[in-house]
Design a protein with these regions (language model features):
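N-terminal beta-alpha lobe that positions the nucleotide/phosphoryl donor
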Residues: 1-283
Length: 286
């Protein structure tokens, strides 16, 4: 992609502490992004709450803030530094949530900060469970029966509509599935859904039919602003659905699928990243 001369200063959000859902790969990708931006002549402002990372080394960025990764802090730093653009895609779920909130509350527009990489529409489509399902349906991707809910009454009605147990609860805009789980009865459903609604930034959970025991695959897909896309890596979880992918044993590349199966899944992954309009790297679970 050509260099943009209208941008002078770019703020990069780190991912914070290493934990399930945000592991060391975000430190590596963030470090590479900072180096690439500086090599292209941009001034880089890095904000990260974890001092024990490569990207926080003094020589990495022009300006480094070791501050909490929360919207109020990022907004305050933007008011001080006045960056031209914000790059959140290298900071994982935490950074994407911050960027989405700052865009929705008007802070980015008020401060004249452009969200680069994946835009707000792409973030919302990937993180909002209802919007994501609509995108999948629009391009003909098969999905399990699922209903997006914003209240406990809707959760109970959705469970009745699905009509079988167990039921999966998936909160929107949370890190590593925080607040989600599998409910085997009504009591567990109420308990997990209450936690999920509380942890979701938009108070939304997806009530989904069970796919426990199914095989889980992961496709790392990269796409640029000119719509060039490629599969970087394929991975196969040894443990079935029901074991958190952060705790599952994973092998790369796919081991038990034929090339014909891989080509079908590859095409679906590429169609999805294009439909979501994601620019950068995306991990697609299948």
């Amino acid at each position: 992609m050509p260099r943009r001369d209208d941008l002078k200063t770019i703020m990069v959000l780190g991912s914070g502490p290493i934990k399930i859902g945000q592991a060391a790969e975000f430190d590596f990708s963030g470090s590479q992004a900072v180096q690439a931006l500086r090599e292209d002549g941009y001034e880089v402002i890095l904000v990260n709450s974890n001092p024990a990372t490569i990207q926080n080394d003094p020589e990495m960025a022009d300006i480094i803030y070791i501050e909490p990764l929360i919207p109020d802090t990022i907004r305050r730093i933007m008011e001080i530094e006045k960056p031209c653009a914000l790059l959140a895609g290298m900071g994982g779920q935490t950074a994407l949530n911050i960027a989405s909130e700052l865009a929705h509350d008007g802070s980015l527009e008020r401060l004249g900060v452009e969200l680069i990489g994946s835009d707000l529409d792409a973030i919302d489509k990937a993180e909002d469970r209802e919007l994501f399902n609509q995108v999948c349906e629009s391009i003909g991707l098969p999905i399990s029966e699922a209903i997006a809910c914003n209240s406990m009454d809707q959760v109970l009605a959705a469970a009745d509509e699905i009509g079988s147990w167990p039921i999966l609860i998936r909160p929107a805009f949370t890190l590593g599935g925080l607040g989600g789980g599998t409910a085997w009865d009504l009591g567990q459903l109420v308990e997990i859904a209450t936690l999920g609604l509380r942890n979701s930034r938009i108070s939304q959970v997806l009530i989904e039919e069970s796919i426990l025991g199914w095989q889980e695959l992961e496709y790392e897909v990269m796409r640029d602003g000119a719509d060039n896309a490629t599969i970087v890596c394929t991975m196969e979880n040894i443990d079935p659905m029901g074991v958190h992918t952060g705790e599952s044993t994973v092998v790369a590349p796919l081991q038990s699928f034929s090339d014909a199966d891989h080509q079908i899944l590859r095409d679906q992954a590429l169609r999805l990243i294009r439909a979501l309009n994601i620019k950068g790297l995306s991990l697609i679970h299948i």
